[in-house]
Amino acid sequence: GIGNADRNSSGKTVTRRNDEETDRINFTTAEQIHTGWDHAANAYYAGELGKWNIDFNADYLFKRSHSDQNAMNNDDATVQADSRMRSSLYAAKLVVSAPLWNGRFSFGTEETFTNRHDIFTQNGFSADADDHIKQSVYAAFADYSRSIRHWKLNMGIRYEHQQTDYYEKGIRIDAQSPTYNDIIPVLAASWSHNGKSFSLSYRLRKNNPDYSLLTNSIRYRSKYEYSQGNPLLKTQKTHRFSAGA
């Protein structure tokens, strides 16, 4: 999609010491957001080859935006900032499945490639930023599920290679460009009989920080308040055990 949006805010900040007012700031912020053309494309295939089911899906996304920010404190123009962002994503997933030993076996691959470039310039209240993040994820996985009388069993494993390349003003920053090689297991069992049931499961989850949290761009909120990402944030891994009845 394409379009523009305007955001305007105003307020005041009062500073007190020992119950006496020491500073008062009336502020007004105006922000114009310009979105360029967003592109999205999808391709998929679902079919059979003998006993094998084949499911393939691929996506492409492209987005860019541009915003101008102007802020005034006590009628003095103090902040001018310009932010530009371009991002793209390619993703593909292939899953092949078939009956096996009275259960179902599946395996496949998944690939994701992302590319985001943020450019931030300002009039002196902070530092300019030029951040470029590229990330590639390659994964292979297998899964098997089966029902045995009152039991339902599921087990799976996934190998994932994740490479991130972080650039500041065109220079790769090794300390902020991690590589992960992870084996991610999934185990689950449930039992049900005569209205009674219980379940057990274990899963390893990975959560990557959003790109907006990794940028060095500084967002002005008031004379005393700024917001900024942290490019040193790492992927979070959580071991999750659950039981229910």
What is each model feature region?
Residues 8-24, 66-75, 117-125, 165-173, ...:
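Outer-membrane beta-barrel translocator domains and adjoining extracellular loop/strand segments
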Residues 142, 183-189, 243-245:
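Feature captures outer-membrane beta-barrel proteins of Gram-negative bacteria and organelles
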